[in-house]
Amino acid sequence: MSNLENLTSKIIEDANKEAEKLLSEAKKEENEIVDEKVKKANKAKEQIIEKTKREAKTKAERVISNTHLKVRNNKLEAKQEMINKVFDEAVIKLQNLPQEEYLNFIKNSILSLDIEGDEEIIVSPNDKNKIDISFILTLNNKLKAKGKKDLLKISNENRNIKGGFILYKNGIEINNSFEALVDSLRDELEQEIIEALFS
């Protein structure tokens, strides 16, 4: 009986050792699996954090860039408004020329043009009363003295211009309105005005 008990005891002891060994290996494998999952989770967390940081940085850079662009555009807009104001004021000063200076301007401008002398002078409704028949006669005499026709006349047509004149003949116009004259000088003078205003 003692042999049987010894054998049974040995079998139970071996079974317990085998069970402990299996439990130990299972526990070790469980720990390895848990460690691997934790490592993967930490790596994923770091990647998410890094991606979020990059996206936040990109978004911040975009916001800063857009803000700089808006500020630059606002500055350019303000500068352009000031430049436009300078040219608008030039037109206003020309509009406010005394009568004699205004008529001299028209006379000298017309005499400096390469015209035949039989054109029509178109002016604004406000300037129609400034140009009388004696002015036209004087102008025609000067044209005749230059070897041109002396048939210049005031047109019955008015134009919505801010001063100056438009010469018209056979569908062709020479625009010497104050706005056109100031605009023609704009490209030439704009850089000088920018330097004077903003440097």
Swiss-Prot record:
GO biological process, alphabetically ordered: proton motive force-driven plasma membrane ATP synthesis
MF terms in GO: ATP binding; proton-transporting ATP synthase activity, rotational mechanism; proton-transporting ATPase activity, rotational mechanism
Signal sequence coordinates: none
Keywords of this entry: ATP synthesis, Hydrogen ion transport, Ion transport, Transport
Homology family: Belongs to the V-ATPase E subunit family.
Keyword Cell division in annotation: no
Gene3D superfamilies on file: ATP synthase, E subunit, C-terminal, F1F0 ATP synthase subunit B, membrane domain
Protein name: V-type ATP synthase subunit E
Any one Pfam family match given in the protein's UniProt record, by short name: vATP-synt_E
Taxonomic path: Bacteria, Bacillati, Bacillota, Clostridia, Eubacteriales
Origin superkingdom: Bacteria
Gene Ontology CC terms, in alphabetical order: proton-transporting two-sector ATPase complex, catalytic domain
Function: Produces ATP from ADP in the presence of a proton gradient across the membrane.
InterPro entries: ATP_synth_B-like_membr_sf, ATPase_E_C, ATPase_V1_Esu
